[in-house]
């Protein structure tokens, strides 16, 4: 059964919580999904996005859950339940402060590869997000992240931004979280999609039968 108290608490956190609380992944994940879904439903209710008028949906990382709610593939309640489990498992995979993420702006592939190679001497680090040409995000252990931040100039990185997150998402350090999520996600019956869904993992259209495994893979895969 859906926990209404949980939603009420998250709603208060969204509007009145401080940055530190909202940066913790067990808070930010359900909060972002709830906010995204509220915006989507407002657009539909105001007929700015008529129901059934869109042919495809996609969501980046956590946004894939909002996209699934939007296309009818999963109910809002089930999405919140999965994100409660997903976010806790992600945080439990590494203690707060031991891992993180860093965005690199305006870098060519050889510069990124060299940064990863250099930083890996201080800890595990992985390519996590390929957002656009010249904008990627790395995930890893905090010593490796800090190495890049402190040595950005000598590594020829135009701009490095440490992200305000509490864990290193979308990399092998989240393997435990993927295993925990797999147990719970296999209990979900996904509905027939109202619109095509494009997967973060494959960048291709996926089906109701494929989405469960793709959501599990997404936890440890580049998106």
Kindly give the residue locations of the regions a language model identified:
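Glycine-rich nucleophile elbow surrounding the catalytic serine of serine-hydrolase chemistry
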Residues: 60-68, 73
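Alpha/beta catalytic cores of group-transfer enzymes, especially the acyltransferase/condensing modules
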Residues: 3-8, 17, 28, 71-222
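A short acidic, glycine/proline-enriched capping/turn motif at secondary-structure boundaries
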Residues: 39, 64-65, 89, 109
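Generic hydrophobic secondary-structure packing signal
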Residues: 32-35, 62, 75, 82
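Structural motif
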Residues: 57-60, 128
């Amino acid at each position: 059964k859906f926990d209404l108290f949980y939603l009420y608490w998250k709603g208060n956190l969204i509007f009145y919580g401080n940055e530190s609380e909202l940066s913790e992944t067990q808070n930010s994940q359900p909060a972002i999904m709830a906010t995204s879904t509220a915006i989507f439903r407002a657009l539909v209710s105001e007929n700015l996005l008529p129901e059934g008028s869109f042919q495809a949906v996609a969501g980046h990382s956590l946004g894939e859950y909002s996209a699934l709610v939007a296309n009818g593939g999963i109910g809002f309640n089930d999405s919140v339940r999965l994100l409660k489990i997903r976010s806790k498992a992600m945080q439990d995979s590494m203690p707060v402060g031991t891992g993180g993420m860093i965005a690199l702006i305006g870098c060519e592939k050889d510069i990124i590869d060299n940064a990863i190679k250099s930083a890996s001497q201080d800890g595990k680090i992985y390519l996590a997000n390929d957002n656009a040409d010249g904008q990627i995000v790395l995930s890893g252990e905090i010593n490796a992240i800090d190495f890049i931040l402190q040595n950005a100039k000598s590594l020829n990185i135009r701009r490095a931004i440490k992200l305000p997150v509490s864990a290193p998402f979308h990399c092998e350090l989240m393997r435990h979280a993927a295993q925990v999520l797999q147990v719970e996600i296999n209990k979900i019956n996904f509905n027939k999609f109202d619109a095509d869904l494009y997967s973060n993992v494959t960048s291709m259209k996926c089906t109701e039968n494929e989405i469960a495994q793709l959501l599990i893979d997404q936890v440890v895969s580049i998106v």
